Amino acid sequence: MSLASLSVSPGKGRRVVVGMSGGVDSSVTAWLLKQQGYEVIGLFMKNWEDDDDSEYCSTRQDLLDAASVADLVGVDFEYVNFAAEYKDRVFAEFLREYSAGRTPNPDVLCNAEIKFKAFLDHAMTLGAEHIATGHYARVRAIAGAHGREYQLLKALDGSKDQSYFLHRLNQAQLSRTLFPLGEIHKTEVRRIAHDIGLHNAAKKDSTGICFIGERPFREFLNRYLPTEPGDILTPQGQRVGRHHGLSFYTLGQRKGLGVGGVKGSQRDDGTADAWYVARKDLQHNILYVVQGHDHPWLLSNRLQALDASWVAGRAPELRGYGAKTRYRQADAACVLEQASQGAFELSFSQPQWAVTPGQSAVLYDGDVCLGGGIIA
């Protein structure tokens, strides 16, 4: 894709507010939309009140990066603080889920409640017709039974597709959303950033919890949840260690268990299989671990999901689909056996590994993301 080929004008002066994080993806998003004729306003969202100096410095640098890009691209730039909304709508639920022994995905809730709700509402007060972000996904308008309908699709760059995190978006949100990066690959995004002289062209992608950053997770969680150490047991009841609190562990976890030196089953060559978290017993505060990646306790043929959210506003028909139970997982063949506005059940053709309560099960029909729910 050449830069010249991007100089078209489908925007025709329409106003769009771009969520600018200071990273390369949102920066190129703003530039692309400006090239397409949109009236672009860049908006930096502060969604976490900094509680240490290093995080303050990181957030400040991101803000400076975003403002610098807006100046280079030639768009207006604003700053808004959504910390109160994030705390009430996302972080409180995040802590409730961990307290209940589940492993939530705050990025899913953050997208639904902050980036595409609080941000969208604010953009509308600025007279915008659309919002845009640097997510790798696509939106497609089709003729539905009751008029125009919007579909959420995977990005063309499958290695960067983020539709999994966006599956809770509804028709109203999708109708106002643009994902310019959904049609191009990440390598092209960095090339564009380099060609137009963006100083953050080589900036590392963020991988931390949504708006909390890349800090030691156990240390962070320990500030908000009480620790209650307990026993680590095998399925046979053998005590192999002590845990720091069930909230700090997730199904399938291998590192940080402190049981590496414990003898268990061994292979023919005398080496031992790794230990994995397999279950949590909240009532008795017991963490169960098993040896071997493919231990039966780690495999599931079925799942139930609650708090279902369907992109089309209605549950899909009962038939075969693909599903993800974690990000970056290949779609697993499954059958949707029961579905309603509030819950659904899936059966899988092949056993699924470490299906984790609190994570999202997301349903796909080819490239079309149908929605999903929270694994029970």
UniProtKB/Swiss-Prot annotation:
Molecular functions per Gene Ontology: ATP binding; tRNA binding; tRNA-uridine 2-sulfurtransferase activity
Record-marked site positions (Interaction with tRNA): 135, 359
Which EC numbers does the record give? Answer: 2.8.1.13
Q: Which SUPFAM superfamilies match?
A: Adenine nucleotide alpha hydrolases-like
The domain of life for this entry's organism is Bacteria
**Region of interest (Interaction with tRNA), residue spans:** 160-162, 326-327
Q: What is this protein called?
A: tRNA-specific 2-thiouridylase MnmA
- Name of the gene encoding the protein in the UniProt record: mnmA
